[in-house]
Amino acid sequence: MKYDHQSIEIKWQRTWEESGAFHCDHHSDKPKYYVLEMFPYPSGNIHMGHVRNYSIGDVVARFKRMQGFNVLHPMGWDAFGLPAENAAIKHGTHPAKWTFSNIDNMRTQLRRLGYSYDWRRELATCTPEYYRWEQQFFLRFFEKGLVYRKQAPQNWCPKCHTVLANEQVIEGLCWRCDSAVEQKNLTQWFLRITDYAEELLADLDKLEAGWPERVVSMQRNWIGKSIGAEIVFPLEGPGGSGNDDSITVFTTRQDTVFGATFMSLAPEHPLVEQLIDGKPEAPAVRAFVERIRNMDRIVRQSDDLEKEGVFTGAYCVNPFTGRRMPIWVANFVLAEYGTGAVMAVPAHDQRDFEFARKYDLPMQVVIQPEGDALDTAAMQAAWTEAGLLVNSGEFDGLPNEAAKQKIADSLETSGKGRRTVNYRLRDWNISRQRYWGAPIPVVYCDACGVVAEKDENLPVLLPLEVRTHEDGRSPLPDTPEFAECACPKCGGKARRETDTMDTFVESSWYFARYTSASKDDGAFDPAALKYWMPVDQYIGGVEHAILHLLYSRFFVKALRDCGYMDLDEPFANLLTQGMVLKEGAKMSKSKGNVVDPTEMIARYGADTVRLFCLFAAPPERDFDWSDSGIEGSYRFIGRIWRLAEELSGVLLPVKACSATAADAATPQGKDLRNKEHATVRKAGADISDRFQFNTAIAAVMELVNALYLAKDELSGDEGGRKVLSSAVATVLTLLSPITPHIAEELWASIGNAGRITDEPWPQWSEEALARDEETIVVQINGKLRGRVSVPAGADAKAIEAAALSEPNVARHLEDVTVRKVVVIPGKLVNVVVG
C-alpha cells in the first residue's frame, strides 16, 4: 500500500484533538514539565524558521511526556503592534480583522504539522480578556512607583510614527523598518527596570547552567554595571567666581582626577543651553548639537569615530587642583551613560587624548610606569596601563588601584563626591504613539492631574470603530468616544491617555497566563501558577537576548513584588535555535529564496518536513535548506513504511525493547537486539542531555539499516520474529516525538493497542548491551566480501586472522598481493590488494 501522508497525518491529528491527547492540568501526581516556544506574531503564514522552532519544542514536549512528565505545551499569538497596523493600512482593512484572519490561517498551518499543543490554552494578546490584566499590572506598578511619566529626548522613528526603547534601536535604525532613528522631546511613560538592575545582574548567575553563555554575556553587558564615583565640578560663575551650579560626572577612574583638564558634555546634556545662553559660542554649539543628536549611538561610541566637539565658552573647576577647565560638547559622550558628562583626562584616556590633540587642549600626566617619566609632548597615545600616581598631591607614589580607594574616601569626607555604582541599563519607555496596542489606563483631569483608572473600570477597551490614518498616525486622539471620559477621582471631564503600550509588555508575561489562560476573575490561578512556573525549557531566537528576555525577567520580579507570584526567574533553561537559510542567506521575499512550509507539507508531508528540520543540523546552528535534504528525509520515511509492509505477516504487537536474551539466540538476533538497546541509549542521551536531535535520528537510521540486513534471517522462527518486532517497535517509539504520524499509523497497523503517543520511552538494559561476540564486516578494496564473529574485545591481530581465514575472503585473496590490512575493532576489516 502506498504511503499516503496526507490522509494518514490528518487522521491522526483529528484523533489527537478529539481525544484530548495533549490536554493537561495542574492536578497531577506526575512531575511537571513546561516547554514553550516563543509565540509568533500573526503575520499570516508560518515560515521555515517557525517550523524549526516549533518542531524542536514539540520533540521536547513529546519526549518528556513519554518519560512520565505532566507536560504543558501551549501556543498563542503576539497580536498587537506595528506590523499588523501597517499591514492593515496597506491592505485597506482594520488591524483587528487582519490579525484574527491571520491567526485563523496560522493556527490551521500549525495544526497541520501535528504539534502537541494544548489548544484549550490558546491566547491572543490583542483581546480584552488578555490586556485587561496588563492594565491591572500597570495600576499596581503605578501604586508602587514602578511606573512614571517624564519628558526626555526619545528615539523617534519617522516612518513608524512612534518612539522606540533604547533596546529597539539597532545601530541607529528602527528594529522594525530600518529607518534612521531621530531624537524628539516627548513626555512618555516609563517602567523602572533600573530599580532591578542589580537583581537582574546577580540572578544571571542562577541561569548560567541552563542558558547559553552568549545570551548571559549579552545581558550582563547591556545592564553594564560600573563601580566608581561621582565627582562634583563647580561651574565658574561671572567674573571667575564660583556659584552653586555644578557638573556631576561619573567615573570608574577617580585615580586620574588630578589629570582632568577639560570637561566633555553630551549634546543632549540639560546644562548645555544654560551654559551657552548669551554667549557668542551659542550658534555654533546649537548647530553642533542638532547635527550630533541624530547620529547613530553605536557609531558615537566607536573607537574609529573621528572625535569632534565645540567649546561652550563656559568653564568649571577641578575640585582637587583648582584648575580652570573649559567645557566642551563632544560627539562621543552619550547622555544615557553615567551623567552625560565626562571629566576629560587626555593623558590617560585615548578618546580624550585624540580630542585634546585635535583642539590643542592641555594634558597632565598623573600616572606613569614605575621608574619612568612620561612627557606629554612626546606621547603618541594615552597611557592607560597601571602605574604610580604623580602630580596628585598627597596621593603621589600610590599604585593607581590603591589610589582609587583613597581618593574615593577623600571625595566622601570632603563632600566633593561619593562612591556609586552606575548601570548602562535605562528605564523602559513603554509609550507608543500608535493605535494597535493596549491602552494605558490613565486619564488627565484639569482638577486632579494624572489619575490612574479604577480596577472596576478595566479593561479600558481599545475602540474598534475607528478609521486608521494612512500615514500611520494614531486615530485615538481624534476619537472622542475614547479620548473624552470622566475622571475616576472627581467625576469631572477628563481626557484619556492616547498612547498605547509597547508590545513587549504583552510578551513579558504571556508565559504565566498560559497556566490559567481562561481564568476570567484574575490574571493567574495561584495554584496553577505555582505548579507550572517557571518554564522548564524556553526556545527561541538569540535576537531576543536583550529585548524580550530581559523585559520578561524584569516583569516577573516586578509582579512578584506586587504580590502576583512567588518567582524570581521565568525561564529555567533556554535554547536559542539557529536560522533556516537558503543558498547561504536568510530567507526573504526580496531575495526570492523563500521555501513555503505549506507547499512542502503538501508535497512531502508534515513528518518529512519535521524530520528534515531536526536532522539537518544541531538545533543551535544555522542550516541551509536543500531540496536533496528533504528528498532524503522523505526516502527515509518511505523506507520505514516499506519495512513494515515487508514484515506485515511477521511482526507481532509487542513493546519496544521487549525481546529477551532467549529470543535472540542466533548471532544475528543478538546483534540486532544489541543494536536496538544501543540505539535507545544513544537517542535518549542525545535528546535528553544535549538536544542533539540530528545524532539521535542518525542512530535510528542505523537501526533501520540493521533491520533490513537481519529481517530475512530472523523471520523464520518465533524468537527471531520477537527480536524483529521489538526492534521495529523501538524504531517507531523513538521516532514518535519526531515523526509522530507515521509512528502512530504503523504502530496501529501492527496490531498494538492504544496510541504510541501514550507509550513510555524505551528502557535499555546492560545485559542486552553486553556481547560475547561481535560481528566484523570484511571488505576487500572497500567491497563487502564477508562477515566474521570474534570474541568481544578481541585485539587487532585476532580480528585480522579471523577475517583473512573467512572462506569467501580467502578465495578472493588467491593469486593477489595484499598491500595493507586496516582493522577497526568492533566494526570492520578492509584488505587492500593490488
From Swiss-Prot:
List the coiled-coil residues.
none
Q: What is its EC number?
A: 6.1.1.4
Aminoacyl-tRNA synthetase: is it a keyword of this entry? yes
Q: Where in the cell is it found?
A: Cytoplasm
Tell me the GO BP annotations in alphabetical order: leucyl-tRNA aminoacylation
Family matches, as InterPro entries? aa-tRNA-synth_I_CS, aa-tRNA-synth_Ia, Leu-tRNA-ligase, Leu_tRNA-synth_edit, M/V/L/I-tRNA-synth_anticd-bd, Methionyl/Leucyl_tRNA_Synth, Rossmann-like_a/b/a_fold, tRNAsynth_Ia_anticodon-bd
- GO cellular component entries: cytosol
CDD domains of this UniProt entry?
Anticodon_Ia_Leu_BEm, LeuRS_core
UniProt name for this protein:
Leucine--tRNA ligase
Species of the source: Nitratidesulfovibrio vulgaris (strain DSM 19637 / Miyazaki F) (Desulfovibrio vulgaris)
